[in-house]
Amino acid sequence: MPALESDRSASTRPSSIGALGGFPLTGMYSASKFALEGMSEALAAEAARFGIKVTIVEPGGYWTGLYTTGMATTEPMDAYAPLRAELEKQFADGSVDSMPHLAAEAVMKLVDSDDPPLRLLLGSAIYDLAFDISRQRMATWAGWEETSRAAEQATEAPEGYGA
């Protein structure tokens, strides 16, 4: 942190679409990305007082070797075969992948920015997905507002709590 502070620097954290929501067959992957983003949000709040910016980069699909040579898998379980087939079809039919150099150009623009955002989505598909997930969450929260608010009551803290 002191080295970053003296330069009024920034930290760029790679994340992924997996941090936007939990998707079938990606639970452990998504959990790691949720953790990375929570840690990065906390770091951003801590580092802001020192003039240090933190950005979480959330890329969509890019033509890399991730899904061919870059991924280790285990023997599929028969019970998951229909779900796996459905997901493979979705990826084949609707996957929007792009050239990695376009992501690199966006990250360079980010690095050169005087006011980088906490989060940067890379790609149209992930941009749309992020908004869809956010709208769904907002609608759910709004639908359960009364129940949510009823679960809290202003009262004095029990003995032993607080200062």
Range-by-range predicted roles:
Residues 1-9, 45:
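Amphipathic alpha-helical dimer-interface segment in Rossmann-like NAD(P)H-dependent oxidoreductases
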Residues 16:
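Residue(s) in the substrate-gating loop at a strand-loop-helix junction
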Residues 21, 42-53:
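Active-site-adjacent segment of SDR/Rossmann-fold oxidoreductases
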Residues 21-27:
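Active-site loop immediately N-terminal to the catalytic Tyr-X3-Lys motif
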Residues 32:
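Active-site helix of classical SDR
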Residues 49-117:
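SDR active-site lid
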Residues 92, 139-163:
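Non-catalytic terminal and boundary segments that flank Rossmann-like NAD(P)-dependent oxidoreductase
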Residues 92, 119-129:
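Short-chain dehydrogenase/reductase
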